[in-house]
Amino acid sequence: MDRHSSYIFIWLQLELCAMAVLLTKGEIRCYCDAAHCVATGYMCKSELSACFSRLLDPQNTNSPLTHGCLDSLASTADICRAKQAQNHSGPTMPTLECCHEDMCNYRGLHDVLSPPKSEASGQGNRYQHDSSRNLITKVQELTSSKELWFRAAVIAVPIAGGLILVLLIMLALRMLRSENKRLQDQRQQMLSRLHYSFHGHHSKKGQVAKLDLECMVPVSGQENCCLTCDKMRQADLSNEKILSLVHWGMYSGHGKLEFV
């Protein structure tokens, strides 16, 4: 029992160490609009803890944006630095934007990366940017709450499984002990019955022999003096199925007995 307890304690320690390593490993969720992210709800996990947003065509200011995790970038030259591309009209604009928070690259508007063209457009962009920030905040709160529940489940499920395993082992040991005790009691009862039947059989045989000796020597000269002995002996013989060598006959008055 002590050995099983030490093994279970070591296994629980290893499980807790593995969970601590997984939880301390930095991973964030990013908004992803690639084809392989459709099945995961337009989200991906970044082990580099970095999300990106970039223009598909750096030379075109009206080019659509693409979003995703920095791990999925094929080229290592775009790793989290804002590249500057010179357009034909002269203004500079970033082709890659990186961030390091959950769903921080969620952008619903193209002009997030584009510079303002006029004062009016800049004012409208500010309002749109504020609404986009509010949406991002809501998404981040929802994601953080889901992440919190997920981490709690990751911690609680192995601990609950370990406790259930310990309870099952203790229950199995208790059942084995009770079964062993029951078998020992049955064995003791069987031995007691055999001992009692053996000694009871020998005592009955002694009583039958004593009865034979008493009936062989009659007290008076009357006939059928052993009638009572015959009845008692026949009852014992019918119960125990013991055959006697003496055949009881009628007393002739001369003390003569007939034997088979």
UniProtKB/Swiss-Prot annotation:
Q: Report the membrane topology from the UniProt record.
A: Single-pass type I membrane protein
One GO biological process term = positive regulation of DNA-templated transcription
Q: Any idea which UniProt keywords this protein has? A: Glycoprotein, Membrane, Signal, Transmembrane, Transmembrane helix
Stretch forming the signal peptide: 1-26
Extracellular side, ranges: 27-152
Q: Name one GO molecular function term.
A: frizzled binding
Where does the sequence pass through the membrane?
153-173
Membrane topology, Cytoplasmic segments: 174-260
Its tissue distribution reads: Detected in granulosa and thecal cells of adult ovaries and in spermatogonia, spermatocytes, round spermatids, and Sertoli cells of adult testes.
Localization, per the record, is: Membrane
Q: Which residues are noted as glycosylation sites?
A: N87
- An example Gene Ontology CC term for this record: plasma membrane
Say what the protein does.
Negatively regulates TGF-beta signaling.
Q: Which family does it belong to?
A: Belongs to the BAMBI family.
The name this protein goes by in its record: BMP and activin membrane-bound inhibitor homolog
Give the gene symbol.
Bambi
